[in-house]
């Protein structure tokens, strides 16, 4: 039996909106598998579609560079927001991004090796660990970039207007689509969601035949919600991104989005417990 930690229960609560006891029970039944627990809770009606995993916990910056026919995003992490604003840290991060765009196709391993000496020197000076975490390239006829406070970086590849593609990049930063078009959603993702929706419909007392018909409409909504062109445009929610792109004679072929610390869980200090520990030690 996997250990059901408080942090795991907390994550499930944040992602489903369900109560603590329901979340703990679901995790026990799923043997600690949070994704299975979410699926089971959705099937039983205890939770709606869960928020995508990826708690932003680490600090650092996202940098973007665009050259002819391609662009690159780089994530560099540190331990605190204070260091993320340090001039020395930012200088190194910008050096890394400049190297990445000047050496198209370089790997994260090559970047780490190239800047290891400077990184180690800065760690010794500042007294805080830091690392080059991710690098992603995007090719295209036109590449538009958008950075949101150095915490979120987006590159959008497409054809047409660079100005319009930048607006779409801002939308991607805000709405987090996973695919370009509804038809791009993988068969595995579609089938997984379809089975969940069928069970939800059947659990409401509907025969399987009727449940399957109900699911068709829900699946169309689902693929629209996770795809860029199917989402309501943040700058004009009365139309979809796809309709907006058609109106300005612009198209998107691909995009990438990085957010500082995605998937990294920061250790949360229990201040009261820490004070009690120190007090006991001084007694």
From Swiss-Prot:
It is found in: Cytoplasm. GO terms for cellular component: cytoplasm. The keyword Protein biosynthesis applies. Keywords: Cytoplasm, Elongation factor, Protein biosynthesis. Residues 80-83 are annotated as: Involved in Mg(2+) ion dislocation from EF-Tu. It comes from the Bacteria. GO terms for molecular function: translation elongation factor activity. Its main location: cytoplasm. Belongs to the EF-Ts family. Associates with the EF-Tu.GDP complex and induces the exchange of GDP to GTP. It remains bound to the aminoacyl-tRNA.EF-Tu.GTP complex up to the GTP hydrolysis stage on the ribosome. This is Elongation factor Ts.
């Amino acid at each position: 039996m996997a250990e059901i930690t408080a942090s795991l229960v907390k994550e499930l609560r944040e992602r489903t909106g369900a109560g603590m006891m329901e979340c703990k029970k679901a995790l026990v039944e799923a043997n600690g598998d949070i994704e299975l627990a979410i699926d089971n809770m959705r099937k039983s009606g205890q939770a709606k579609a869960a928020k995508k995993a990826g708690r932003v916990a680490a600090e650092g910056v996202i940098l973007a560079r665009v050259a002819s026919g391609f662009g690159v995003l780089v994530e560099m992490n540190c331990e605190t927001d204070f260091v993320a604003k340090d001039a020395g840290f930012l200088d190194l991060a910008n050096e890394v991004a400049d190297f990445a765009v000047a050496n198209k196709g370089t790997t994260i391993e090559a970047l780490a090796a190239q800047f290891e000496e400077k990184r180690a020197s800065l760690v010794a000076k500042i007294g805080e660990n830091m690392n080059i975490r991710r690098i992603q390239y995007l090719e295209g006829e036109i590449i538009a970039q958008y950075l949101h406070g150095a915490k979120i970086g987006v590159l959008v590849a497409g054809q047409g207007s660079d100005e319009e593609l930048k607006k779409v990049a801002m939308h991607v930063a805000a709405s987090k689509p996973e695919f370009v078009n509804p038809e791009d959603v993988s068969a595995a993702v579609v089938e997984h969601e379809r089975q969940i929706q069928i069970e939800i419909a059947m659990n409401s007392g509907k025969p399987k035949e009727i449940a399957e018909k109900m699911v068709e409409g829900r699946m169309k909504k689902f693929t629209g919600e996770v795809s860029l062109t199917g989402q309501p445009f943040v700058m004009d929610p009365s139309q979809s991104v796809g309709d907006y792109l058609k109106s300005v004679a612009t198209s998107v072929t691909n995009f990438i989005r990085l957010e500082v610390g995605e998937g990294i869980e920061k250790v949360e200090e229990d201040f009261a417990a820490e004070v009690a520990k120190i007090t006991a030690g001084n007694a």
